[in-house]
């Protein structure tokens, strides 16, 4: 049958393996030239050794400091081979840094605990808190490091050193495999050319074999004296402030008049500079819903879901015209359903709800200088107003059913408040953009409701949340600031705004083609598709549209074969012993599907739909053609059910349930999952083209014979086609639902 097309693509894929397309060889070869960026890529700090002006080679030496490390344990064995400097960026508040020792205090075991103390605070040891000793607390008169420790006859002692540096720490010197020396010194200033890290030291044994060092905050490691580097890091480097005037913002948000737009160069050397940007922005949120109509008699709607929206707009910032691009997406949406079970009952299979604690993500990018070279960024801050949606005509939709007043789905009020700002990357039809993601949380809604007609008619359902919007746009304003590491020479840029890849271009072509493809797929006659599905389709049938493609048949075949190798269907078929039956994955892992002259399976329908539609579209691009073939194999008819027949018992499994029933009486029986899994690996698995509910409805309505029931259970193609030709509404509705899932 038609699915033999996929079998041929699998069995003859050797053709593309030995026939690589020349264009691939031209476009896939990459030569990488790069500059060693020093330890910035490791430590999120400036490069280790600065250059001295214009030079013609790398200005950076081997990294001396690594980090920040976030692991919670340092193994003892990693500290006994060489001197190790354990460094911390000065915390904002008092915090526990590390501890070596058992989980609870034991006077017979040596231990130590390191804290950072903020000036004006009292620090109390966690490890030693259970003992009665005044040394377990410390009143900090200045920023400091405090080492609480016990060893031998010393019940509890503490060592305190000043911590005035931006980055500082302690020195750990190994003695042998079971002992090490902790060294500390007051870090007050950088007046000297060198620094003695060992003004105070104490030798500690290991508490117990197997006890390591617990870390409670991120840290850096150095294997050689980092004093010179830390001294250079400490020097003030503010050099240039570029200030621009900004228009006054007349808005009801909490931001008031807003700050001046500032670009502040805070550090600079031969190749790199750190620039702090502060900008006011105008943010737009566009919420758009997508409505999918089901098959049948016109009363069935499959879903109403919120779409991920790409939206562009322009505004003026400090006299400069700014072109902005945002991507709006959603998280933690709720799902609702509505409707009855009869074919003429209006129903919505699923509609999304934005309710309290749902999230709206807005990824923002504009064409101003702040997003040029936006690769390494730190200290991202934002102060953004919220969004308010109130009822409008764009927040109602009327379902055009065949008979009666059109039911309406309505939304009321929605309030979004700003939650936080993150770095992100958004993908458009043409480019990938490094962006700022603004996270908004839903804090209140006035509810959704369904009416029998216009908004003033009777309500038939209601609930909390925001259910529908037809592209309504809301505005807010705010400020953003961040520090970006960029080249000192402004001519260097990263390919962000102008990037365009083959894959993105292909996605754009697919998007342009999607509506036409889906419209043709919806208009096809059921009997035509079933007749085509019952015919022995081959690769030559697929290439009937090749004359419209500006490539040779040989190149088209190679492209299709190569693309097909990436599909899940091909990868699973390549595993000869693959018999895994995964219930939670919509049964996609069933490979031993029944094959005989009369039995119809899902691949028969999907390949017939793909061949029919592509031939009618007359596609002129070989990449798009290959992409559609591969997508049809994996994505068409995602909602699949399978069954097996054992004597007079049918075992059936769907995406939502599993059950067994008698083939004559259709009475359900207990389902044995172990037995079913064993049968799935040994017996042919039948695609449930006509589902159990439809078979039962046909028997109850028309009183068909046991022989016809058996043929429907076995997905007998001639029997199904005869019901279609007789215009049986139940069978037509079922097949229409399957065909409606054959969409790009």
UniProtKB/Swiss-Prot annotation:
GO CC terms of this entry: host cell endoplasmic reticulum-Golgi intermediate compartment; host cell plasma membrane; host cell rough endoplasmic reticulum; membrane; viral outer capsid
Pfam families on file: Rota_VP4_MID, VP4_helical
Hydrophobic: annotated segments: 396-413
Residues under site feature: Cleavage: 231-232, 247-248
Entry keyword annotation includes Coiled coil: yes
Keywords: Capsid protein, Coiled coil, Hemagglutinin, Host cell membrane, Host endoplasmic reticulum, Host membrane, Host-virus interaction, Membrane, Outer capsid protein, Viral attachment to host cell, Viral penetration into host cytoplasm, Viral penetration via permeabilization of host membrane, Virion, Virus entry into host cell
Domain of life the protein comes from: Viruses
Coiled coil ranges: 503-523
Biological processes per GO annotation: permeabilization of host organelle membrane involved in viral entry into host cell; virion attachment to host cell
This protein's record includes keyword Membrane: yes
Similarity annotation: Belongs to the rotavirus VP4 family.
Protein name: Outer capsid protein VP4
Species, as recorded: Rotavirus C (isolate RVC/Human/United Kingdom/Bristol/1989) (RV-C)
